[in-house]
């Protein structure tokens, strides 16, 4: 089991410095692949549509996911509800490359997340803070992402979550060793992972940005804040020119420290997706899970 987990972490490392795009059909998946995406997330409704339409959001139709798998050569991810291990069993059976236990879908279990160590396929999970990140890693997550606030086109929550995780890691590095067990208790996180972060100053898995990223500048901002890569959900295919915006966000993620490249990548993209103010949301997806 330990060897499998190490392999999954290494598989996730291969996505580092890349962009993962939400797609709802094979045509969008091909656009994402041609734009330079390192993987796609297959789902029936992007987060902005889930937010707009409401109701219970579940994992996508396996047939649709298989069509996307067959359409592209890059890895395909798909989402399951928090705690819904049977949805995860189904996705593993149809051959997805990664499973996202996602707060964007309606949680199936308000007490427990999936024990990801029961699966061979690697999992990605969202986190708002270091405690959440380490709990998910303790359950077997091979990759972490900020929760942000998906479907809003508003990057503020992703920034908040990344800054929180980074500041808590810096604080942990300054914590005396004899106090680490108390920190583990307070965070509800495995002690060995607390020790790892205190020593290394980073998570033991890669950490991507997700939730509200809509522009090349948003992607570069999150990379400069220390993220290992970018998830873009509604931001591409809810914009005026998806093909051009997809390529621009990939370029911005690669050249995130070069303002001249960022300026050029941001030109003539057409309108970005309509953004939402966080304080006016009826449902905050990031509050789901623990």
Swiss-Prot record:
Signal peptide (residue range): none
Q: EC number(s) of the enzyme?
A: 4.3.3.6
| Annotated catalysed reactions | aldehydo-D-ribose 5-phosphate + D-glyceraldehyde 3-phosphate + L-glutamine = pyridoxal 5'-phosphate + L-glutamate + phosphate + 3 H2O + H(+)
Q: Reply yes or no: does the keyword Lyase apply.
A: yes
Set out the biological process GO terms recorded for this chain's protein. Answer: amino acid metabolic process; pyridoxal phosphate biosynthetic process; pyridoxine biosynthetic process
Q: Does the keyword Metal-binding apply?
A: no
CDD domains under this entry? Answer: pdxS
Binding annotation for D-glyceraldehyde 3-phosphate:
163
Q: What is the uppermost EC class here?
A: lyase
A molecular function (GO) term: pyridoxal 5'-phosphate synthase (glutamine hydrolysing) activity
Amino-acid positions noted as binding D-ribose 5-phosphate in the UniProt annotation, renumbered to this chain: 22, 151, 212, 233-234
Concerning InterPro entries, the annotation shows: Aldolase_TIM (IPR013785), PdxS/SNZ (IPR001852), PdxS/SNZ_N (IPR033755), RibuloseP-bd_barrel (IPR011060)
The protein's annotated pathway: Cofactor biosynthesis; pyridoxal 5'-phosphate biosynthesis
| Classification via NCBIfam families | PRK04180.1 (NF003215), pyridoxal 5'-phosphate synthase lyase subunit PdxS (TIGR00343)
Q: Assembly and interactions?
A: In the presence of PdxT, forms a dodecamer of heterodimers.
- Designated name of the protein: Pyridoxal 5'-phosphate synthase subunit PdxS
Which species expresses this protein natively? Clostridium botulinum (strain Loch Maree / Type A3)
Classification of source organism: Bacteria, Bacillati, Bacillota, Clostridia, Eubacteriales
